[in-house]
Amino acid sequence: MKFTIHAGHNPDGKKACGAVGLIKESTENRKVKDEVMRLLKLKGHTVYDCTVDNGTSVSDIVEKQVEKMNSYSGIDLHISIHFNSGANDKEGNKKNTGTEVLVYNTSGTKYNTAKRICKKIEELGYKNRGVKTRTNLGVLKNSKGQALLVECCFVDDKDDVTLYNYKTMAKAIAEGILNEVIVENTTTSNNTYVVTCNSLNVRNGRGTEHKVVGSLKKGDKIVVWSFANDTKGQSWGSFRYSFNPDVIGYVSKAYLKEVK
């Protein structure tokens, strides 16, 4: 497949740069964009970078992005990477504000892709704010073909930022786009872990405050999709706990050992 991708806004420190909170949008969205590109290319797809770093205004940036996007033919999906703001929760309230994906309308393949991306980011521990239609955004309105805009998480919410890691965020986005689990072939890891304690609770979210939905026994092996921290900084792994595709389990990394 063919994709275009870009990180929104000018770089940090320039006019019309992204939101600034506990982290900076224009720094993080470029890191996420680069990693999504790497993963899509790893799976054999063609990806064009349409990021603009020299815009003179918000509208000029969007115009230049759209011009780049529409210069390529045969594109299956245009991807715009952003971070949200407006939560105003820099101290943290143990509840993250979450993720959402924006589309111009619900027609075509982009809508289901957007839902998958939301679900994948939700698996990292973020609140799923869902897919929303926005008809006033230039990159969605004026691009040719299917397009979506990912609002990864909120830069001004401590709980969002505590969970955030650009690599796990990018992996979730790439997996949502491709509708597959991406496992990189390395000599050191196959993503398989064995349980080291007698009984390990499986929860429906990252953190001990979440409901216990089952348990694993010592010696059980699982394939972990990704690790991310809870609001206390403890690492939790997500995995497919049952044959029900809607059931995602979370276990503490402290009681797992990698199988090499």
Identify what each model region corresponds to.
Residues 3, 14, 26-185:
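Active-site-proximal helix/loop segments of hydrolytic enzymes
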Residues 185-201, 214-218, 233, 257-260:
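SH3-family beta-barrel domains
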Residues 129, 135, 198, 235-237, ...:
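Extracytoplasmic/periplasmic beta-strand context in beta-sandwich domains
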Residues 203-205, 240:
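Predominantly extracellular/luminal cell-surface or secreted proteins
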Residues 8-10, 84, 106, 155, ...:
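Solvent-exposed coil/turn segments that connect beta secondary-structure elements
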Residues 206-211:
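Short alpha-helix capping/helix-loop boundary micro-motifs
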Residues 1-22:
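Short glycine-rich His-centered loop
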Residues 215-255:
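SH3/SH3-like beta-barrel superfamily modules
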